[in-house]
Every structure is written in structure tokens, then in C-alpha cells.
Amino acid sequence: MNEKATAAYTIVNDLGLHARAATKLVQLASKYPCDVQLSHQGQSANAKSVMGVLLLCGSKGTVVEVTANGAQADECVKAIGELIASRFGEPS
């Protein structure tokens, strides 16, 4: 079955999508078989690419749209949302 899921999330950690946070996001996205894209201000990036995620320049307060296509798309988008909401595991 070909699923599609999309959701928008606000980056809430103080340092934004820096290297460590981007790596955690990519590692999580890579656990799912679906294609995953992040979008911000007309730019999009493969959520399974650290360089792509870093190039989006997601600072605190940035709203990113997560779109997944394929098997487990909904679960993937929700998991990424939970990671973002948890500040990528960083202290608040």
C-alpha cells in the first residue's frame, strides 16, 4: 500500500537543526522504508541526508513540513514530529 503523510512542525530546541540534531533526524528517518522530505520556505531536502537537512537552515522557531510517501509514511512523520517536539533529546 502506498501511503502519504504530511505534517508541519516547529523547531523548538535553542540550537535549531544543527549537526547533532540533523544526524538524529536522519537516523530516525532512515529506519523507515518510505521516502521522506523536509520543506521550508520553498526549499526541500531528503530527510535521509544530513547535508540536505543542514542546508534547510532550520533555526529555533522555523516551521518545517515533513512529507513521507510509501510504506509506514504516517508512522515516520509522527516519529519525526515526536523527535522535534522532544528538542532532539537536548535539555530545555
Language model features: what each stretch is:
Residues 6-8, 23, 69, 74:
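Intrinsic disorder/low-complexity segments
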Residues 10-51, 55-60:
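Compact, glycine-rich, soluble single-domain proteins
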Residues 2-8, 63-65:
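Intrinsic-disorder/low-complexity, polar/charged segments enriched in Ser/Thr/Lys/Arg/Asp/Glu/Gln
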Residues 6, 10-12, 83:
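Residue-level signal for pocket-adjacent positions within structured domains
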Residues 59-92:
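C-terminal structural segments of small proteins and small subunits
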